[in-house]
Amino acid sequence: MRLKDISKTATLAWSPRGVNDNQALLALGGYTGTEGSKNSDTLLELWNENPESQKPVGSIDVKTRFYDLAWEKSLDKPMGVIAGSLEDGGIGFWDPAAILKSDEASASIATYKSENGSILGPLDFNRLQPNLLASGDNKGDVWVWDIKHPQQPFALPKQNRSSEVHVVSWNNKVSHILASGNATEYTTVWDVKLKRQVLNLSYLGAAGVSAATGAVNSIAWHPNNATRLATAIDDNRNPIILTWDLRQPTVPQNILTGHQKAALSLSWCPEDPTFLLSSGKDGRAMVWNVETGESLGSFPRSGNWYTKSSWCPSNSNRVAVASLEGKVSIFSIQSTNTDKSQEASIKGATSIDDNEFFNNLPSIAGSQEPSFSLPLAPKWFKVPVGARFGFPNKIVSFSPNSKEVTITSAPDEVEQDEAKSFHSSAKFQTEKEITDFCQKGVEESASEEEAINWKLLMAVSKRASRSKFAELLGYKTLKPKNDEDDSKVDESVAKDSTTPNELSKNANNENYDDDSSFYGKLAESVQEVSIADKKDAEIVKDSFKIFNPEDSDLEKNITEALLTGDVLSAVKACLEEKKISEALFLSTFGGKECRKCVRDAFYELQEHKPSYMRLSACIADNDLQNVVDNAEVSEWKDIFVFICTYATDDEFAPLCSTLGQRLEDLEDEKSIRSAEFCYIASKSLQSYANLWLKQLATSTKTSKAASAYGAYVEQLTKLMDKVSMFRSIVVYKDDELSATKDWKLAGLYEVYIAYAKILSASGKFDDAMSYLNLVPTEFPGAKEEIQRLTMLLEPHAVPPIHQIKQTGYAPVQPKTSQASSILPTVPRTTSYTSPYATTSSHITPADVHPLPPPSTSTTAGWNDAPMLGQLPMRRAAPSMAPVRSPFPGASSAQPAAMSRTSSVSTLPPPPPTASMTASAPAIASPPPPKVGETYHPPTASGTRVPPVQQPSHPNPYTPVAPQSPVAAASRISSSPNMPPSNPYTPIAVASSTVNPAHTYKPHGGSQIVPPPKQPANRVVPLPPTASQRASAYEPPTVSVPSPSALSPSVTPQLPPVSSRLPPVSATRPQIPQPPPVSTALPSSSAVSRPPIATSAGRSSTAASTSAPLTYPAGDRSHIPGNLRPIYEMLNAELQRVSQSLPPQMSRVVHDTEKRLNMLFDRLNSNVLSKPLTDELLALATSLNAHDYQTASNIQTNIVTTLGDQCEHWIVGVTRLITLSKSTT
């Protein structure tokens, strides 16, 4: 990401680490040698990295421009010293602290020139001894300056091939080691202490890579390894960067290719040596992974050379590059919000008027430049050590000194005795278990209140009546109202002692809902008493007047109201005269309102209001909530008994919970126990559990466990036992298991999950699952725990991808590349001979069209190790007509490459007609051997006979054939200098591997098949199969030679008939139809079908490979279950790789995907053999686990043992392994 652009053609130097409180500063000085000088070119400026700052923080005019700048710390200068090689050939020193103040007078420390008057160029400070400065001049001298005594520099001895010194660089670990590079291709390593050369490095090239013959433009030493360095070669035709390890100085450790022109500057990341920054003449600044040799990307390009690039020593997130475009840019290695900014730029560009577009074109192009983010995490962003708890009871950890992840068992803090007390949530299922548990709680109670609570739990478990609850609080058995005074109470009610619900109904007089108040019952009582005493008191039956003259006006009004049925008016008239008795008597004939009116008036007339009046009023109004809310909470026992006596079943639990909440709010120990009593009586799990959860935090302080965690587990176990028992007693059914939010028991659910984790850590997985089953699946954290336990308890529930068998392939240890271990390989050619084509003795080579070559040979940053021991390849000369054999009647077959015996031509007869019976075709006799050859008959197994020694006098004029991809990767060893058997026959040009499923049509005229280009990515293709052994340019014979035509001195012994007959199999290979019979000779030989294998097993597998697809290409819905993991893992890895690779590799990814789709199509049609699919499954498993060594071993085994079943898709598998390894 571009942070800042400074308009200046300059050379640069970052401030060293530890200077300016590690706030990075960038020194810029005008770059010499550029045209169109400006006044600002002679300014020495200091800039900060703040993108918003558009002016230097300090500058002075030094009246000169610079070849190079260097900045290092100093013992007597807090900001260090800046050194610069001047335009006039001298060297100057400046104080950055004075430059920050723009103090020109005190900024300059000193200026010196070399003794021989040479022009000094490159500079570099010694980081271990900052007083030492190295520089090189245009006469080939390397100078060492001591800034303590700058008047006395000394020069190192001149090299034999002295020329202008382009670069000097001090070693970062050994203070007296210096490297320099000049206009020759040599990099010289110096021992400054001994003032002598230690080593000269140069690269003479290897197979496929040209020699590094240009000048050395830049040298960068590894920050941490004293023997490693990188050099940039000034060769536009072969722009390479070489990394060296001086322990093996004869060959570079790696070759970095990707620049289009020579690199001019190198800078190693100071904090993570994995990264190397380079910039060059192609206007590119690239970042490399030095360990793998691949390019990680490049910063936005410049329109001119990038002359110098440098990683910031104090902030490795920043890099600076200077270009001849007149710009110094500061970049970040991480881009942010690039997509949004580019989208906004594109929208803005589309809205610009056509007339103004070209005026804004530079800014538009700059805003849409490609962004760059480092795809690998730098070392300073990586976590050096870490650990995570795993499941069950595991610790996964890693350390900085190992790339392996360690999995260990976490120490179990739960004692064995405590673990024995763990139980499932279904522990309390019988009455005896509950009773024993409650009795144990009574015995272990620390207070009387706690013991009463345990007794109440026992009573609730036995379905005791409310009378039992009152007895526990010291009250006698509850009785119905008037039980002691009224002898006329129903005997069934008097004898009832079953349940508190029925008892409360009787005590509550049963009919309170309508006219069941005390006064209504009073009327009934009066009526009952009247009827009972009817014999003793008869109603007066004398005559009377309704309106008596002696009655007062009030009495007459009351009488009139009664006659008309207005009882309420009569009652109110009595109350106005304070005739309470009369009003009370009259209200017995009225409704509720009459009775309430009398009751309220009576209550208001009482000067002293006793509590029984308040209670009676609440009872009469059925307002028990009034008593529970307003009575003194210290009398909670009386309130509880009042609730037991008068509350209905529906009212009982809410009223008890309200009373318990009032007690819980007091927050003292005794009140908490009292609240617990009320919650138990109400059978409210929510209130009871919340109270226990509050007690859990304080109960651990009183535990006698050895540790705080042990105390927590102990108290949590007791809580779970209480909750489990309570759920069993009340037969609790949770209605919120399907809820998704607003859970009333959320606190209890969290404890369930925590306790399940403790049980899992102790190995009690079934018990843990029993508690998780009590938690809603949508509760946070529940689903994950259930899934993890399910995987342990039900292994069959794990997806099949995790049941893949482990591969038996061991990783191959990497070998050190040696120059002598790399040998050239001889190309192998392939062709097919048509059994139905008319042959001729005068035939030109077949016009075979090879597969399309790659359009470009650029590697796009993809590098291989250098190949040594093989000369550069030359383009093959045009093919010559084959030389006829001197033997009469012999065929003119040209020997194929890689073979020291004559090829055997097998000409089966035409296919049988309908009238013919199935019979084995006859095998033709092979041609006689040529001069100097020994005849070797074909073997029954179809394998080639080992070749015998060829003459050791090759034709020096024979052109060297280029390698084909098949030959380059062939694992069949061959002699590096194998000449053809005929010294005048040129070596055949290697052709591309021909797929047996393709049929090529012959064309008229003789055409030379061009050699294939070097592939963009070197992969390991499959070796040629048995059907690809013959030469592509082998002319077919005119006829089958008879034994009499053979030389008498050489009599071939034909193999037995059984070995020459094709096997009879139910599945026959696909054979192309013969062409129409024609008497005319074809202009060139037709490409033939593959010969039939001579092994039944190989025939069947080859047939299955070439079998037609059952389903259309691209369909993946019919892949069998046992093969689907192959598809899923390979496809997932392909998608990961395609997102990780840079855009330059898109063609490689596309080709890999196309080849893998061929494999997926065959998996979908289930046409691959079981041995092959087993190997592919093991390969995919290793690749998915990033075990690339094992995956490569399996791929090699597939190619070597099952190669005849492999098609073009094997190249895609091989390439996927390579790409996956490079992007991990």
From Swiss-Prot:
Domain of life: Eukaryota
Signal peptide coordinates: none
WD repeat intervals: 18-57, 61-104, 114-155, 160-200, 211-254, 258-300, 302-341, 388-410
Biased segments, Polar residues type: 495-510
Residue numbers of Phosphoserine PTMs: S1042, S1044
Classification via Pfam families: SRA1, WD40
Region (Disordered): 480-512, 840-866, 879-1116
Record localization: Cytoplasmic vesicle, COPII-coated vesicle membrane; Endoplasmic reticulum membrane
SUPFAM superfamilies (alphabetical): WD40 repeat-like (SSF50978)
GO cellular component labels: COPII vesicle coat; cytoplasm; cytosol; endoplasmic reticulum exit site; endoplasmic reticulum membrane
Modified residues (Phosphothreonine): T499
Compositionally biased residues, Low complexity: 914-923, 960-976, 1035-1065, 1093-1107
Keywords on record: Cytoplasmic vesicle, Endoplasmic reticulum, ER-Golgi transport, Membrane, Phosphoprotein, Protein transport, Repeat, Transport, WD repeat
GO molecular function: structural molecule activity
Gene3D superfamilies: 1.25.40.1030, Functional domain of the splicing factor Prp18, YVTN repeat-like/Quinoprotein amine dehydrogenase
GO biological process, one term: protein transport
Membrane topology, record value: Peripheral membrane protein
Keyword Transcription regulation: no
Annotated S-S bridges: none
Family to which the UniProt record says this protein belongs: Belongs to the WD repeat SEC31 family.
Assembly information from the UniProt record: The COPII coat is composed of at least 5 proteins: the sec23/24 complex, the sec13/31 complex, and the protein sar1. sec13 and sec31 make a 2:2 tetramer that forms the edge element of the COPII outer coat. The tetramer self-assembles in multiple copies to form the complete polyhedral cage. Interacts (via WD 8) with sec13.
Summary of the function given for this chain in its UniProt record: Component of the coat protein complex II (COPII) which promotes the formation of transport vesicles from the endoplasmic reticulum (ER). The coat has two main functions, the physical deformation of the endoplasmic reticulum membrane into vesicles and the selection of cargo molecules.
Protein name: Protein transport protein sec31
Organism, scientific name: Schizosaccharomyces pombe (strain 972 / ATCC 24843)
